[in-house]
Swiss-Prot record:
It catalyses: an alpha-D-Man-(1->2)-alpha-D-Man-(1->2)-alpha-D-Man-(1->3)-[alpha-D-Man-(1->2)-alpha-D-Man-(1->3)-alpha-D-Man-(1->6)]-beta-D-Man-(1->4)-beta-D-GlcNAc-(1->4)-alpha-D-GlcNAc-diphospho-di-trans,poly-cis-dolichol + a di-trans,poly-cis-dolichyl beta-D-mannosyl phosphate = an alpha-D-Man-(1->2)-alpha-D-Man-(1->2)-alpha-D-Man-(1->3)-[alpha-D-Man-(1->2)-alpha-D-Man-(1->3)-[alpha-D-Man-(1->6)]-alpha-D-Man-(1->6)]-beta-D-Man-(1->4)-beta-D-GlcNAc-(1->4)-alpha-D-GlcNAc-diphospho-di-trans,poly-cis-dolichol + a di-trans,poly-cis-dolichyl phosphate + H(+). Pfam families: Glyco_transf_22. It is found in: Endoplasmic reticulum membrane. This is Dol-P-Man:Man(7)GlcNAc(2)-PP-Dol alpha-1,6-mannosyltransferase. The gene is ALG12. Disulfide bonds: none annotated. Belongs to the glycosyltransferase 22 family. InterPro entries: GPI_mannosylTrfase. It comes from Arabidopsis thaliana (Mouse-ear cress).
Length: 497
């Protein structure tokens, strides 16, 4: 029937996108809150959506952070999310629904760019490699979870995916242009990827030096002009945010203040956790197809160069994951095609076993991540049961630094009678002298306040004998206190601490 034919064509074109999008959407709905790494873009999206042109009400003017960040990514996401947010506001739903909408929009943007890359994989390597690429991506928790997190690295990832797609397509100059935009506007460290790719293209005579120079300089000037124009307005001063980030992290080497890892950490911890079964297969992919090293070597060089920086996080190299997945998909396709041969049959069985292990690791990792936002759950619980609807007075909630870093953003705030303070550097002994009704903090006891309940957070994974072999260990992370002078009009029985 015609309808069935249309549905079949739709699924053939967008089926893989629906799979990846559904997995990413589940992660967002189940764990909608955000952490300190995302705070700037999250607060910026909130302010663009709710305060619009009233810049004086924007969060970044009160809490500017260590270095300025660009508003361009927040603007793009907010423009696409605004119709949904308007409906949410009209229906009177909590603002956290708007956060979910914004994160879903970001996920759609990133997965749309991944779709472009995937289509080029299909054209260059075939349908089967494309299928394995989707399978690997869907089994990797970190990539699909991160693609909805409003981090500068993820905003840059969208442009990197477009660069990868053009690279595979043979459009080398546009590929370099996308990488330059990502470097200048979102993440200056993308230059560590731009350099190896550009050098390889020059050495293989895939591009002309002078033509590439014209492209790169023109694109860089356009990107610099755009970010300075937009961000100077938003920050109310002349600023190129990503240059200041580069100066702070690379020249002053201040990023080490947030901790350091060994030089091999990306290869012995970050990549194995993020790639799972694709990690060993990505190495095999470079051996079974002569086309793969052309794409893998620059990306591998990117990770090696990044390893020189002391401060390391998985999100810094998240843009390498799609290309490693391509190499792994090529290897998996070769193994599958030769599965009837004796040796390859054994390799195929091992690969299938690792697929199952990867799925299990993804479930465990998601469960751990679910409990990484105790402050968000604590504030939600307070809103649900902490205040009667007929009381006219304001209810002040103080959120300490730990609380603000682990789940709470302005999207988590409710309207009157709730008021919020994130005032920093208040010693615990001074809190009783302030006009705070409730406290959300990391202290189990505060003078002048009664602890109503606590929220547990992820502590560690523990191996045990028996079933299940892996146990999620949780620990009390965030406590909610109420001023002792404040009477509970409903006489609720709080669980206490």
């Amino acid at each position: 029937m015609p309808t069935d034919s249309k549905m079949a064509k739709f699924l053939q074109s967008y089926g893989y996108d629906l799979i990846l999008g559904s997995v990413a959407a589940i992660y967002v709905v189940m764990a909608p809150y955000t952490k300190v790494e995302e705070s700037f873009n999250v607060q910026s999206m909130h302010d663009i959506l709710y305060h619009r042109h009233h810049l004086d009400s924007y969060d970044h003017l009160e809490f500017p952070g260590v270095v300025p960040r660009t508003f361009i990514g927040a603007f793009i996401v907010s423009v696409f999310a605004s119709p949904v947010v308007s409906i949410i506001s009209c229906l009177g739903f909590p603002k956290v629904y708007s956060l979910v909408a914004a994160r879903l929009v970001l996920g759609c943007i990133i997965l749309s760019t991944l779709r472009f890359f995937r289509i080029q994989i299909k054209k260059k390597f075939g349908n089967q490699v494309e299928t394995f690429f989707v399978l690997f991506t869907s089994l990797q928790f970190h990539f699909l979870f991160y693609c909805t997190r409003p981090l500068p690295n993820i905003l840059a990832l969208g442009l990197v995916n477009l660069a990868y797609g053009n690279w595979l397509k043979g459009n080398f100059y546009p590929a370099l242009s996308f990488l330059i935009f990502a470097t200048v506007i979102f993440r200056c460290d993308t230059m560590l990827l731009l350099g190896p790719i550009g050098l390889e293209l020059l050495l293989t005579k895939s591009i002309s030096f002078w033509k590439a120079l014209k492209y790169c300089v023109g694109t860089a000037l356009l990107a610099v002009g755009l970010t300075i124009f937009v961000d100077s307005i938003m920050w109310k001063k002349f600023v190129w945010p990503e240059f200041e980030v580069f100066w702070f992290n690379s020249i002053l080497n201040r990023s080490s203040d947030w901790g350091t890892h060994s030089i091999h950490w990306y290869f012995t911890s970050a990549l194995p956790r993020s790639l799972l079964v694709a990690y060993p297969l990505s190495l095999l992919g470079t051996l079974v197809d002569r086309r793969v090293p052309f794409f893998i070597v620059p990306v591998l060089s990117f990770v090696i160069l990044y390893s020189k920086l002391p401060h390391k996080e998985l999100r810094f190299i998240i843009s390498s994951v799609p290309m490693f997945n391509l190499s792994a998909a090529v290897a998996a396709s070769r193994i599958y095609n030769n599965r009837k041969k004796t040796i390859w049959k054994l390799v195929n069985m091992v690969m299938l076993a690792f697929f199952a292990i990867s799925a299990g690791c993804t479930v465990v990792t998601f469960m751990a991540s679910y409990y990484n936002y105790p402050s968000g759950y604590a504030l939600k619980r307070l809103h649900q049961i902490g205040h009667p609807a007929n009381v006219a007075g304001e209810e002040w909630v103080h959120i300490d630094t730990f609380g603000a870093m682990n789940g709470i953003s302005r999207f988590c705030e409710d309207d009157f009678p709730w008021r919020y303070s994130k005032e920093e550097e208040i010693v615990v002994e001074e809190l009783r002298n302030r006009n705070f009704t409730y406290l959300v903090n990391e202290h189990s006891s505060v003078d002048g306040y009664k602890c109503l309940f606590y929220e547990e957070g992820f502590e560690r994974l523990e191996l045990r004998r028996g079933f299940p072999p892996i146990v999620l260990v949780k620990k009390a992370k965030v406590y909610l206190h109420r001023e002792m002078k404040k009477e509970d009009p409903f006489h609720k029985k709080w669980p206490g601490c």
